[in-house]
From Swiss-Prot:
Function: The UvrABC repair system catalyzes the recognition and processing of DNA lesions. UvrC both incises the 5' and 3' sides of the lesion. The N-terminal half is responsible for the 3' incision and the C-terminal half is responsible for the 5' incision.
Keywords: Cytoplasm, DNA damage, DNA excision, DNA repair, Excision nuclease, SOS response
Protein name: UvrABC system protein C
Family under the similarity heading: Belongs to the UvrC family.
GO MF term set: DNA binding; excinuclease ABC activity
InterPro entries referenced in this protein's UniProt entry, alphabetically: GIY-YIG_endonuc, GIY-YIG_endonuc_sf, GIY-YIG_UvrC_Cho, Hlx-hairpin-Hlx_DNA-bd_motif, RuvA_2-like, UVR_dom, UVR_dom_sf, UvrABC_protein_C
Quaternary structure and partners: Interacts with UvrB in an incision complex.
Native organism: Lachnospira eligens (strain ATCC 27750 / DSM 3376 / VPI C15-48 / C15-B4)
SMART domains given in the database record: GIYc (SM00465), HhH1 (SM00278)
GO biological process, one term: nucleotide-excision repair
Domain GIY-YIG: 13-92
GO cellular component: cytoplasm; excinuclease repair complex
Amino acid sequence: MFNLEEELKKLPAKPGVYIMHDKWDNIIYIGKAKVLKNRVRQYFQSNRNKSAKIVQMVSHIQYFEYIITDSELEALVLECNLIKEHRPKYNTMLKDDKSYPFIKITVGEEYPRVLFARKMKHGAGKYFGPYTSAAAVKDTIELLCKLYKVRTCNRNLPKDEGRDRPCLNYHIGQCDAPCQGYVSGEEYRRRIDEVVAFLNGDYKKIMDRLTTQMQEASEKMEYEEAARYRDLLMSVKQVAQKQKITADDVNDRDVIACASDGQDAVVQVFFIRQGKLLGRDHFHMKVAEGDSKSDIISEFMKQYYGGTPFIPNIIMVQYEIEDADTIAQWLSARKSRKVSIVTPKKGDKEKMVELAYKNAQLVLTQDAEKIKREESRTTGAMKEIAGWLGLGTLHRAEAYDISNTNGVESVGSMVVFEDGKPKKNDYRKFRIRTVKGPDDYKSMREVLTRRFTRGMREREGLEDSHGFSRYPDLIMMDGGRGQVNIALDVLKELGLNIPVCGMVKDDTHSTRGLYYNNIEIPIDKHSEGFKLITRVQDEAHRFAITYHRSLRDKAQVSSVLDSIEGIGPVRRKALMKHFLDIEKIRQASVDELMKADGITENVAENIYKFFH
């Protein structure tokens, strides 16, 4: 079971993305943090100063997970991509599906433009980003225009040269008007090269220049101008920060890294699409003696890419693998396009592989703890129950319940738990045949008698096997002394010896304890055994009442339709097959009713008049 306090203590003091799940494993919120430890803990502190939405979201959190990154900027971009992928319920602020902006330089033009772009189109120019602040990108473009006098207009140059007067940017000193021939193509290209160099990270010269201009303006007491340079300098620092979480091209690629503890291995895959990290997944691998991480990755690739429909252009792996060329040829044949397998040795790509490895190591550690928690809530819980009852072993348990409405459509349910987990293939349901009226004791006697008589006949080979021949180590009755005694009587009559306990409830219909060997055994409500008993009890009730309601609804439909002149079993079945439920039949017109098989105009009119 997920222990919130313990997991909060383990949060790292690193940037990353956190992912909140509800009890059905749905992702309900994704966020980013500069320091995961501080940000995630804030959700589980006092509700004071929290919005109603956050309070509600926190109330639905069952567990959380996280992905570590190397910077807050990387976390922001990853958060955006994951939210696009999963669209969590509580991330309402990002419903506009806005993408982070790029700076685009139309390098294919004779006089390239520096533009703001939301989408990246292959072959349409040179892109830088994505960046996290649209305002910073616009400020940076404005800065570049002021420093290098490059254009941002849509004029077709040199075709439109001299056709119109210079635009406003020329008059405010942000463009040297190549549209008028005021700057040569060679000089303009040199300026564009400097812009590209700046956006590639060579921005020290510009920052020094801005700093000098800011100081000079301050010394001249031109404080507004100094503040403007200061703000632009801050924007440059933000825009110029590099992020390895985004690749420098739009090639689709997977990044694969492996972590192993010698017994188990986790392979982490980062999925980079159109140059952006869209998500990640991890896979468990069985480790054979002598397997290296290179062997594990090689085997993973053969199994994974043999079953996935999409193969990226480039696969970046943590270690060089012996059969890389063969695997690459195989994948290239499957994709009908060259696939490269590379092992980065330096730069951002190596750091990206290292980041995948860190997350693989994190998953390996978390999964080891998760396995322990799962064992505690399943096999561990069964051992607790066995200990309370003094049973040697407890592998399989069956639980029974009865459901009816004032004795109408009475049914029984049998649910099975093995090693603390529901085994739904072995569930059985019983329609009560011999009992009239609401008598749960007699109904339970019939269910148990039928179940174990059928089991005995299957064991003797007198009937085909339908799963009844396997007996439980424990029978769990929904109730106390009365229900337990019914079960013991049935077993005694059939000559069977199976332990029986009752799941006793209090006045609020909540589980209180176990009734066994004529005594009620109190149990710790915080124990895993108690929680398992509650799950068993709830599942038996759910399975019984679901079956009962389905029979009751069918009976109500049959009763209503049978009251209509001209409707017999065949036409009733045809109507239900066509309309699916009684309400749609009630709302249908005469023409719509006649579309069902066997429904004539006269019969359709009878049905319509009956409901109207």
